[in-house]
């Protein structure tokens, strides 16, 4: 009898253990904005081992774990395309910055400096940002510096894609004449396009190329720099160039067509003046919908209606913010864009699938079968800043929404009725 009772207890404990460790989950009764279609639909999502395996609009799929969204909006996890998450903690404190290089220029990669325990990561994750593209600060070269993609799950076993984009700048933000900057970019791209597989076959071969090139010698190219330039021309590496003036955008379009660049323009405050040219040449844009007041003579055509104008023209849009740390404010920018005429579904795409497609993040950015389950359940409208995530799943894992701010709040309100001396 005792043996039978022990056996029953063992079976119960084992079954409970399996249930707790089960890796399949269904999110039911959700209003789904999938990042693909403009409109939402009611449905249920089945997740197995971190992957979306079924989406049903009728019956609820079976799973060991069930989360009832109760009609709330769910979206793909938002992807911030322009951040310094994990490499800058306090901008004014140099010892917390890993975004600048003193030796390398074009080939400078920030990937290995990423800190998954940055206190800024939980803060942005708790506001719906599940992944980010982290970019270095511009080097002394007009193009140069490599950004990487990171999941914001705070795991020491970092999930990332290294060196997925190069950055650059052109226009009034530079320290020299834009004519000289454009000529230098052209010369660098011409040098890169002259490289072949034989030149890149060994470090010794690359050293010979550097010695034989007056440009490479003058700019003190290193091995990493030449390899990065070769990838830019021959590996379809995205090139993000920050510029604003309409005439500068036209010049960059000419360079794109000359060298077959995978060009992305960031800033682009005068993009609405050349919307047709941007769309015709298939150039994605990273813009700040809130930034509608000219900050320089390069931005005189800035206006609050830019995003709906560009969307109507057919441009691929992504959003960034001018403030560091609070990268989650891209959803506030999306809300401003919608308030001024952009479609709601288009704004969700700008926060999710447009980023994934632009940077070749093939299994992220949308809620569809086969994609990783980066999903946010919102308590209300995700484009309303006062609305917060109720649940954030990254790779199907229900992540912790505790932040340093919430811990401080809880610490100091816990014993409010006690005199200050006796508070913990």
Residue ranges of predicted features:
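Polyanionic/metal-chelating signatures
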Residues: 126-263, 388
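Active-site gating loops and adjacent loop-to-helix segments of metal-dependent hydrolytic enzymes
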Residues: 91-114, 208-219, 284-287
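C-terminal cap of metal-dependent C-N hydrolases
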Residues: 30-33, 369-412
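Glycine-enriched alpha-helix->loop->beta-strand junction motifs that scaffold or abut catalytic
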Residues: 256-263, 280-286, 314-316
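Histidine-rich, glycine-flanked metal-binding segment
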Residues: 32, 36-75
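His/Asp/Glu-enriched, well-ordered alpha-helical/loop segment
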Residues: 90-91, 95-101, 105-107, 238, ...
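Sec-dependent N-terminal signal peptides
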Residues: 5-14
């Amino acid at each position: 009898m005792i043996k039978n009772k022990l056996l029953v207890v063992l079976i119960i404990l084992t079954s409970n253990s399996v249930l707790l460790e089960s890796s399949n989950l269904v999110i039911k009764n959700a209003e789904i904005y999938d990042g693909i279609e403009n409109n939402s639909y009611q449905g249920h999502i089945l997740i197995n081992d971190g992957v979306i395996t079924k989406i049903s609009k009728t019956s609820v799929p079976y799973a060991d774990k069930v989360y009832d969204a109760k009609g709330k909006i769910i979206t793909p996890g938002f992807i911030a395309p322009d951040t310094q998450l994990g490499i800058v903690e306090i901008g004014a404190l140099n010892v917390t910055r890993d975004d600048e290089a003193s030796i390398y220029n074009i080939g400078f990669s920030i990937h290995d400096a990423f800190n998954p325990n940055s206190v800024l990561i939980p803060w942005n994750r708790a506001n719906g940002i599940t992944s980010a593209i982290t970019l270095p600060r511009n080097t002394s070269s007009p193009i140069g510096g490599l950004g990487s993609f990171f999941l914001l799950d705070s795991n020491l076993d970092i999930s990332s894609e290294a060196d997925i984009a190069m950055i650059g700048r052109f226009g009034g933000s530079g320290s020299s004449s834009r004519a000289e900057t454009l000529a230098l970019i052209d010369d660098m791209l011409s040098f890169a396009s002259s490289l072949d597989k034989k030149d890149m076959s060994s470090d010794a071969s690359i050293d010979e190329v550097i010695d034989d090139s007056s440009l490479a010698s003058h700019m003190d190219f290193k091995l990493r720099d030449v390899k990065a330039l070769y990838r830019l021309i021959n590996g379809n590496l995205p090139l993000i160039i920050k510029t604003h003036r309409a005439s500068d955008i036209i010049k960059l379009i000419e360079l794109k067509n000359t060298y077959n660049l995978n060009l992305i323009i960031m800033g682009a405050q005068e993009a609405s003046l050349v919307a047709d040219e941007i769309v015709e040449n298939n150039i994605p844009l990273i813009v700040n919908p809130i930034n509608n007041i000219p900050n320089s003579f390069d931005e005189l055509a800035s206006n609050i209606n830019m995003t709906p104008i560009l969307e109507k023209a057919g441009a691929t849009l992504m959003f960034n913010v001018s403030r560091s740390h609070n990268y989650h404010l891209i959803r506030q920018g999306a809300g401003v864009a919608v308030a001024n005429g952009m479609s709601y579904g288009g704004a969700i795409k700008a926060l999710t699938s447009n980023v994934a497609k632009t940077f070749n993040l093939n299994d992220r950015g949308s809620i569809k079968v086969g994609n990783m389950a980066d999903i946010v359940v919102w308590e209300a409208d995700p484009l309303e800043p006062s609305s917060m995530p109720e649940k954030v799943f990254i790779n199907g894992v229900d992540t912790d929404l505790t932040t340093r701010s919430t811990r401080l709040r809880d610490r100091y309100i816990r014993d409010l009725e006690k005199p200050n001396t006796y508070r913990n």
